[in-house]
UniProtKB/Swiss-Prot annotation:
Its EC number is 2.7.7.18. The gene is nadD. This is Probable nicotinate-nucleotide adenylyltransferase. It comes from Azobacteroides pseudotrichonymphae genomovar. CFP2. GO terms for molecular function: ATP binding; nicotinate-nucleotide adenylyltransferase activity. Catalyzes the reversible adenylation of nicotinate mononucleotide (NaMN) to nicotinic acid adenine dinucleotide (NaAD).
Length: 190
């Protein structure tokens, strides 16, 4: 089975995450998209993270009706900080019948060279880079890299949503309904 790994904090999950995953499942030939919830991104501030169990619950609510989406929490049991290379190897060893491909946005592609063992990732795993309108992709000719130029660009970020909630903005159309209500009612209020 060909599985796309969409890793992220999902802090909170929003329609941009879901639209990209849906596009990749429907148009790029993935059998499944696994949402890999990272407990802590080594390149981000941990202080802004919601509780990981809450992030899991919100993601479960968001994808429950689509059988090509699954959630992967394999990273939760790994030493912290955990790194993408270690997670990919663990997935490869634990599920040898599957082909795992890393999905990243062009915002992450431009800093990919800062990732731990990025060359090892590049040599051993396929990477699909999807476009983000505020980030120019640096195209790189390598057999394991695919630039998905036609994917829809939905420029919503979790940081934008958190900021909007704190400012009292109406963000109901940026997140699945049940998720939006729970986030607004319980989180990020000043």
């Amino acid at each position: 089975m060909r599985i796309g790994i969409l890793a992220g904090s999902f802090n909170p999950v929003h329609i941009g995450h879901l639209a990209i995953a849906n596009y990749l499942a429907e148009y790029e030939g993935y059998d499944k998209i696994w949402f890999l919830i990272t407990p802590q991104n080594p390149l981000k501030n941990e202080g802004e993270l919601m509780n990981q169990n809450l992030r899991l619950r919100l993601l479960q609510k968001s994808i429950k009706d689509y059988n090509r989406f699954e959630i992967c929490t394999i990273e939760w049991g790994m030493p912290r900080p955990s790194y993408t290379i270690d997670v990919l190897w663990k997935l490869h060893l634990d599920f040898p019948q599957n082909i795992f491909e890393l999905i990243i946005g062009s915002d992450n592609w431009i800093i990919f060279h800062h990732w731990k063992d990025y060359r090892t990732i590049l040599e051993n795993f396929k990477i699909l880079v999807y476009p983000r309108s505020n980030y120019k992709s640096i195209y790189f000719n390598h057999p394991n890299i695919y630039f998905c130029k036609d994917a829809p660009q939905i420029e919503i970020s979790s940081a934008f949503i958190r900021k909007s909630i704190v400012e009292g903005k109406d963000i109901r159309f940026y997140m699945p309904e049940g998720v939006c209500r729970e986030v607004v009612n319980n989180l990020f209020r000043p």
